[in-house]
Curated annotation (Swiss-Prot):
Record key words, sorted: Ribonucleoprotein, Ribosomal protein, RNA-binding, rRNA-binding, tRNA-binding
Protein purpose: This is one of the proteins that bind and probably mediate the attachment of the 5S RNA into the large ribosomal subunit, where it forms part of the central protuberance. In the 70S ribosome it contacts protein S13 of the 30S subunit (bridge B1b), connecting the 2 subunits; this bridge is implicated in subunit movement. Contacts the P site tRNA; the 5S rRNA and some of its associated proteins might help stabilize positioning of ribosome-bound tRNAs.
Keyword Cytoplasm: no
Disulfide bridge positions per record: none
Biological process annotations from GO: translation
Subunit field text: Part of the 50S ribosomal subunit; part of the 5S rRNA/L5/L18/L25 subcomplex. Contacts the 5S rRNA and the P site tRNA. Forms a bridge to the 30S subunit in the 70S ribosome.
Gene label: rplE
Single annotated GO MF: tRNA binding
InterPro entries xrefs: Ribosomal_uL5, Ribosomal_uL5_bac-type, Ribosomal_uL5_C, Ribosomal_uL5_CS, Ribosomal_uL5_dom_sf, Ribosomal_uL5_N
Cell inner membrane among keywords: no
PROSITE patterns recorded: RIBOSOMAL_L5 (PS00358)
Family statement drawn from the similarity comment of this UniProt entry: Belongs to the universal ribosomal protein uL5 family.
Protein name per UniProt: Large ribosomal subunit protein uL5
Amino acid sequence: MFGLKQFYQNEVRAKLAQELDIKNPMLLPKLEKIVISVGAGAHAKDMKIMQNIAQTISLIAGQKAVITKAKKSVAGFKIREGMAVGAKVTLRNKRMYNFLEKLIVISLPRVKDFRGISRNGFDGRGNYTFGINEQLIFPEVVYDDIMVSHGMNITMVTSTDSDKEAFKLLELLGLPFAKVR
């Protein structure tokens, strides 16, 4: 792998400065963190499945996952306060760039009928979120080891407040956005 962090520092920053007309290099947008999260849904009651979900995203991220707990009880969903409801991993620095490179080069091309990720995942504050329907697109996940097939949300947090600047950053990093029709 060619080193996405070096690619960002050597090429992407120069292109961003030119295209966005930013003179101060400290104001250039950068990727701050990537959060991978999974909601367990109906499987939240089964602790073995929760452990398996946490183990799966730990394998994918290369870092230990944290099991998330409900902050409030919700009777409609049969959830009690403190009950395990999902798992998440927050990646920064080297692990973040390694994961992003693996996602772009290996995993996303393995998605069936892949035509690019949606451009609609920006939140208005420069962060981008998209979902993956199945964890099997990652090479670390072995089919026989998973108990439940689940998807995941991937959120990329950038240092900018502008969706336009964040889009340009992610596009230059190589994220395959869907073509506009």
